[in-house]
Regions:
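HIT superfamily nucleotide-processing domains
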Residues: 2-137
């Protein structure tokens, strides 16, 4: 598929947002979603997939991604808020399945280099299984 273009306004600044639909060449998470790159999948559905983080920061650390390529949280929210809702719902389903929903967990979206985003494909970190501290670091 090609790419779509839409215009959004974030903080009063309008600009084009380019949406590249799955798969994007050289995108690690698109490769995982396409079963081209191995990962420890914990659950999936037609729109999202959840797999264990290769560098866990807690006893439970799972990433939930959309199967479509969206580079970050702001772009996903601006172009497909239904998919964002599905992603968050899947994160909660993962917490339930992993047994951390009752004691508590974090859902974290890192956005941009300074936000700690290392893969330019939006993903939610579901982190739990221990007492979390604040600030997160």
């Amino acid at each position: 598929m090609g790419s779509q273009e839409t215009t959004i306004s974030v903080g009063g600044v309008a600009g084009p947002v380019h949406v590249k639909i799955f798969p994007v060449p050289d995108c690690l998470f698109c490769g995982i979603a396409a079963s081209e790159i191995p990962a420890t999948i914990v659950s999936s559905n037609p729109r999202t997939i959840a797999f264990r983080d290769i560098n866990p920061q807690a006893p439970v650390h799972i990433l939930v991604i959309p199967r479509e390529h969206h580079p970050n949280l702001a772009e996903l929210a601006a172009t497909d808020d239904g998919l964002l809702a599905d992603l968050v719902a899947h994160a909660h389903e993962v917490a339930l399945a992993e047994g951390i929903a009752d004691t508590g967990y974090r859902v974290v979206f890192n956005t941009g280099r300074h936000g700690g985003q290392t893969v330019d494909h939006v993903h939610a970190h579901v982190i739990g299984g221990r007492q979390m501290t604040w600030p997160p670091g």
